[in-house]
């Protein structure tokens, strides 16, 4: 159902408490400040060189660890980007090439994926991130998920102090 598959971010509260953010994710949501930039800023604070080799690698702690295609689709939807509209006869029209606002938003989202302190995920899917136990090992601050999976599908979360927030809006 749409409610059971509502997407958002599972976050490790213990990591979050250590990053020095101004507010909790819940406070950002409550204050209508849970935006893509807020997520990126707090995710960047979540990066930590765990193995001390001064290189960004898979042994480090990252801000966001999820499938880029799954997370990108949620960012696009949450940003109000429309790729298709209707013409005067009601037929679908691909109108992205003429929508500079949508292009600018998509480029901003792409920029987030290029900052390896914010996002660096060697896994191919959210299921892999969870199956590999990255959040259970406290190696990632945020991972995509949905509420119904927190009590059933993501069993490794049983011993992790996690929270859940919706996907952020664009601005």
Region spans (language model):
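Beta->alpha turn/N-cap motifs
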Residues: 68, 145-150
């Amino acid at each position: 159902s749409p409610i059971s598959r509502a997407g958002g971010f599972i976050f490790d509260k213990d990591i979050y408490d250590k990053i020095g953010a101004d507010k909790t994710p819940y406070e950002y949501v409550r204050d209508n400040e849970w935006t893509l930039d807020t997520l990126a800023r707090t995710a960047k604070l979540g990066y930590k060189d765990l193995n001390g080799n001064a290189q960004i690698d898979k042994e480090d702690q990252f801000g966001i660890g999820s499938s880029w295609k799954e997370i990108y689709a949620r960012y696009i939807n949450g940003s109000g980007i429309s790729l298709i509209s209707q013409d005067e006869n009601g037929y679908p029209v691909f109108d992205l090439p003429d929508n500079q606002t949508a292009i600018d938003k998509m480029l901003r989202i792409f920029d987030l994926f290029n900052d390896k302190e914010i996002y660096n995920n060697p896994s191919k899917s959210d299921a892999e991130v969870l199956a590999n136990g990255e959040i259970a090992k406290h190696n990632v601050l945020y991972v995509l998920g949905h509420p119904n999976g927190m009590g059933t599908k993501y069993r490794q979360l049983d011993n992790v102090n996690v929270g859940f927030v919706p996907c952020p809006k664009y601005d």
